[in-house]
Design a protein with these regions (language model features):
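Structural preference for long, well-ordered alpha-helical segments in enzyme cores
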Residues: 25-33, 61, 94, 114-115, ...
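Catalytic core of bacterial c-di-GMP phosphodiesterases, primarily the EAL and HD-GYP domains
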Residues: 13, 17, 44, 84, ...
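Cyclic nucleotide signaling catalytic output domains
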Residues: 8-17, 24-39, 45-60, 64, ...
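Catalytic core regions of nucleotide second-messenger enzymes
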Residues: 1-7, 37, 104, 140-147, ...
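C-terminal EAL-domain catalytic cores of bacterial cyclic di-GMP phosphodiesterases
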Residues: 124, 130, 174-183, 194-215, ...
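Signal-transducing alpha-helical linker
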Residues: 21, 53-60, 64, 70-73, ...
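Catalytic strand-loop-helix junctions within cyclic-nucleotide turnover domains
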Residues: 2, 7-25, 50-53, 81-86, ...
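Active-site core of bacterial EAL-family cyclic-dinucleotide phosphodiesterase domains
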Residues: 13, 57-115, 147, 152, ...
Length: 260
């Protein structure tokens, strides 16, 4: 048997560290190493002062995260989904935004790293689901009919054996039909064949009538058989396929093939 090994490498030259002593150089190399690990096996990153500033900001956000979730600073912003054929509202997607009292609106690429660092993905999911269902209920009472709301669920949440029970409890609490809540799952999560809990949860949610959307389609390795296996209702083509679709004939061909 042949085993192939790889490693992630963080590099710091002594002249780039805040101070040229061993402790600072090693700490700076560790920051670069953490970023290399996030890029996957075999990645290499060289330290820069910008990395330290970002690491310090991440540390600050991580310390403030729990209070932000409890105080309602992190809430969903609702992005409309419009039917291209009719121009009518097809639903909303709930996008998490942190309305920080000092830094202003913080977008997911930054604070989701803090979420991962602190292991609070589940708590974030609970907050976004609660506010999304609450909004649906309020819109109904105001006479504003919204077909559905899509909520993103992380791989950590989808591994929770009690996830289906928790979501069902929330929709019953707000008296929202299951068909009006869409579960959005990243393609990379669906590709994790070895995780039976994830596949069981997604199938169970589909059986309860929840919509299943596959997000960022085209960035992973999801086969057509997986789309059937997970009872996917819709795929959301990754933006990399359509960014220059008006100029790139190959993108037009690939996107057309996916849609058909």
């Amino acid at each position: 048997t042949t085993c192939y090994l790889s490693c992630s490498i963080g590099i710091c030259l002594s002249g780039r560290a805040p101070k040229a002593d061993a402790e600072n150089v090693l700490a700076s190399a560790q920051i670069a190493l953490e970023l290399a690990r996030k890029e996957g096996p075999g990645a290499t990153r060289s330290f820069s002062p910008k990395m330290r500033r970002e690491a310090q900001k991440l540390h600050t956000l991580s310390a403030e995260l729990e209070a932000a979730l409890e105080n309602g600073q992190i809430r969903p912003w609702f992005q409309p989904q419009i039917c291209a054929d009719t121009g009518e509202l097809a639903g909303f997607e709930a996008l998490a935004r942190w309305e920080h009292p000092e830094s202003g609106v913080i977008l997911p690429p930054l604070f989701l790293r803090a979420i991962e660092t602190t292991g609070m993905s589940g708590r974030l999911g609970e907050v976004i689901l609660y506010h999304s269902l609450s909004a649906l209920k309020s819109w109904d009472q105001a006479g504003f009919r919204v077909p559905s709301v899509g909520v993103n669920f992380s791989s950590e949440e989808l591994r929770n054996p009690k996830l289906v029970e928790k979501i069902k409890w929330e929709v019953d609490r707000f008296e929202v039909p299951t068909s009006r809540l869409t579960i959005e799952v990243l393609e990379s999560v669906v590709c994790q064949h070895d995780d039976d809990t994830i596949s069981r949860n997604i199938r169970a949610l589909a059986n309860h009538g929840f919509g299943i959307d596959l997000d960022d389609f085209g960035t992973g390795h999801a086969a057509i058989s997986n789309l059937r296996r997970f009872a996917v209702n819709r795929i959301k083509i990754d933006r990399s396929f359509i960014t220059n679709i008006d100029k790139d004939s190959e993108q037009q061909i690939m996107t057309s093939a996916i849609l058909r």
